[in-house]
Amino acid sequence: MCIPENMWTPPTLPLPLQSFPKENIPIDKRTQKCLLQIKKLCSTQFSLNKEYKSTFNLIDYKLQRIIQPHNLSVNPINSFWPHTVERLVVPPIYYEMLSNQQIYTLDYLQINPQYHIPIKSVQKSKQKAFQLNLLPLPRQKFRQIQLESYMPSKLESKMTSICEESLPKTVIFDYHGYFDLKQKLLTSNTLLTARLNPISTSAGCRQKLKFTTHWPSWTIEINTDISNISRLHKVLFDENFNKIELFKLASCNLKVERSTRIKKNHIATWKLDKLQLKELDWDPLKKLKAYSVQKKINCDEVHAQATFIITPLKLVLMPINSSEIHILQNNYGNIVISAKSFGNLQPKNTIESSQVSNNNTKLLKEARTTGSSMSDRSTSITSYKCSSLVPEKRSLLDSNLISIVQLKKLRTSYPQSTESHSGEMSLLRLLHSNSCKTEIQQIDTWYDTAKLNTTPKTTSFKLEGQDIKKKVSIIANEYDISTTYQITRLLRERQYSNIEEYRIKLPCHFILSFSSCLLLVEISKVFQCITAGELFLERTLSILIKHFRVVHVFIEYEPNTELYDKDIFWKAKLILNNPQVRTIFIPKFSNNLTTWMLRVTTIQGQKFQEMVKDNTLSHFNINPYQEYLIQEKLRESSPSRLIETLVFGDHVLDGILTPIHINSLKIFARENWHLT
């Protein structure tokens, strides 16, 4: 058999190798698998190109590039490579020889230097053989256990659906219309890099991410019961808060129509400390005073100073209750505006009826002596001087004018009845008349009849030494025995013994009437907190407001408080800003509280023991004053009968009881009451 010249002939092995005797060698399973794989490799067909020469170094470089396999996952046992240009097959003549001596041929190729294969190590020679398709690529198999999951976990299914998350750049708060503030977007550059990385559940799985511009917004539910107190509490403990912010006016942004677009100027709020305000030279009219207008008339320069008219602002004051006039009026010297502090609660004595009567007699005597002079109207206007314009008497009016004004007030205080209308005499007719005797008699008769018929509408009172003729009762609650005992002792020292002690489950010291109570607190306890964010008086006042229409809170302070802390008064007033709460400041160890209680507490001119006979309604936190009014309202029925009327929707007691009392009585009547 002749071999063609252009075909490659493998070298023959030496004969001594074939003469070796056969032996049975024990082989483990691992070597058996290796031998089986070698047998399969020996069965593969070597594919060589017809254009190849007898040596490897004569192969064209372009053909080598074509034959080189790509990195594809192909079964190395299979001899067919789909990426090659053509399949090179060895003729069947040399197939038997190659199948028997393939391993020795590869070893010979690695050692023989005539093929110009640079061999440095066995590992590099194997890599070169793999590149020339002489050896297939090895593949390692691993045992994989595939179990069917009958109950797939929810966590794994959710992990596959997790998208990339990012923190929002804006924070928007929705107050549901409680604040008329414009929402302003707050951008921050620090949040751009703070992005969460995606969680890779599988190696080859990628999810498409979609970013939207709709940023989330959070809603805040505001509790309407304590919203006012909690808001004032936050303002009170703000270190940067200043009183000037209470008087700031909201400025509106005007739209300007222009052809070119301009940037919007965001109006920001400003805050200044007290030290910065003192350092500022607050004189806005300083530049306006030095302003001058320059005009040219007949080629002459005339400098005329410009005048500016500044209209004062109109102040709208809130209405003040009549019970607080004696505390808030500046005439009594309670509030010192220059020092910004509160004074003593003790008011000065007002003009009494005795002083008015003395002024009346003086006026009548002067009218007798100067009657003829007043009838003569030939006096000139220039002979009189206005007392209010005299620099020595700017503070008060003339004494004669005061007496005339007081007489006018007394006359208007009495109602005009038909019987005394004929005897009335005006003050101007008295001054301009000649017959003074008859006029004096008419005035005396009118004054006496008015005293007998009616009483004046507004009478002056005097707190010190007031004679209490009515049998008025005051209820002392055993809420704080030490405090109530001190006040009751002061009341009894002033010869007031109508004090009744009761144990009512309400946090107040005294009950003054059916709709008002009294609470005495030290100024240091106003700013104390029971828990985080809850004040000491917040829970107490929320209970008293439900059971009473008016709550009088007396705050005791030491006299030295005005020196070292002046702002504590308006802070306490601000935190107790409620229409049902009346805040009054009194100094410690003073009789102002007892004087105020004696003036305010009045009830029907009867003793407390006589008017209250049944304490059935006290279980519903109804005070004895309300029980008395209920008995007066429904004399024919008993308190048990009153509960029956509530079942049928009777609204007779709406003006006496609060809504919480009526609801508690209705619940009791519907659940535990059986009609007979």
Swiss-Prot record:
Subcellular location: Nucleus; Chromosome
GO cellular component terms attached to this protein's record: chromosome; nucleus
Molecular function as annotated in GO: DNA binding; nucleotide binding
Main location: nucleus
Entry keyword Nucleotide-binding: yes
The entry's keywords: Cell cycle, Chromosomal rearrangement, Chromosome, Chromosome partition, DNA-binding, Meiosis, Nucleotide-binding, Nucleus
GO biological process, one term: meiotic cell cycle
Highest taxon of source: Eukaryota
Task performed by this protein: Required for initiation of meiotic chromosome synapsis. Involved in synaptonemal complex formation, a structure that tethers a pair of homologous chromosomes along their lengths and plays a central role in recombination and homolog segregation during meiosis.
Family per similarity comment: Belongs to the ZIP2 family.
Protein name per the record: Protein ZIP2
Native source organism of the sequence: Candida glabrata (strain ATCC 2001 / BCRC 20586 / JCM 3761 / NBRC 0622 / NRRL Y-65 / CBS 138) (Yeast)
Lineage of source species: Eukaryota, Fungi, Dikarya, Ascomycota, Saccharomycotina
Gene from which the chain derives: ZIP2
